[in-house]
Amino acid sequence: MSPSQLIGFLLLWVPASRGEIVLTQSPDFQSVTPKEKVTITCRASQSIGSSLHWYQQKPDQSPKLLIKYASQSISGVPSRFSGSGSGTDFTLTINSLEAEDAAAYYCHQSSSLP
């Protein structure tokens, strides 16, 4: 494996019609090295309270829930993963990144379902 770990981020786009909520993540892609602190942001087009969840997905695997309701930890998920935010602005933080954290990360809202 190369010295730098590649972490991919997905941009989630929901058509903004009839009050539907658009989630925008940044950055789209980031190349980082082990032990770095990584921050991923997710912005909602309107307030969703704390109804924001973070997922990790590795190739050929199903998405894994990392954080629920903005900041609630999930049993079995390493403590280096944490979430914060409310309303429209949310953050996923990975402290002291490890090689096994190379994956796609994305946010999902449950405030308004199709």
Curated annotation (Swiss-Prot):
Where does it live in the cell? Secreted; Cell membrane
One Gene Ontology CC term in the entry: extracellular region
Q: Which InterPro entries does the UniProt record give?
A: Ig-like_dom, Ig-like_dom_sf, Ig-like_fold, Ig_sub, Ig_V-set, IgV_Light_Chain
Q: Does the keyword Isomerase apply?
A: no
Give the top-rank taxon of the lineage listed in the UniProt record for this protein: Eukaryota
Stretches for region Framework-3: 76-107
Annotated region (Framework-1) at: 20-42
**A Pfam family name for this chain?**
V-set
**Biological role:** V region of the variable domain of immunoglobulin light chains that participates in the antigen recognition. Immunoglobulins, also known as antibodies, are membrane-bound or secreted glycoproteins produced by B lymphocytes. In the recognition phase of humoral immunity, the membrane-bound immunoglobulins serve as receptors which, upon binding of a specific antigen, trigger the clonal expansion and differentiation of B lymphocytes into immunoglobulins-secreting plasma cells.
- Source species of the chain: Homo sapiens
**Boundaries of every Ig-like domain copy:** 20-114
Q: Where is the signal peptide?
A: 1-19
Region (Framework-2): which ranges? 54-68
Which cysteine pairs make disulfide bonds? C42-C107
Quaternary organization? Immunoglobulins are composed of two identical heavy chains and two identical light chains; disulfide-linked.
Q: Identify the stretch(es) annotated as Complementarity-determining-1.
A: 43-53
Q: What is this protein called?
A: Immunoglobulin kappa variable 6D-21
Q: Which portions of the sequence form the region Complementarity-determining-3?
A: 108-114
- What keywords would UniProt list here? Adaptive immunity, Cell membrane, Disulfide bond, Immunity, Immunoglobulin, Immunoglobulin domain, Membrane, Secreted, Signal
Q: Residue ranges of region Complementarity-determining-2?
A: 69-75
GO biological process, alphabetically ordered: adaptive immune response; immune response
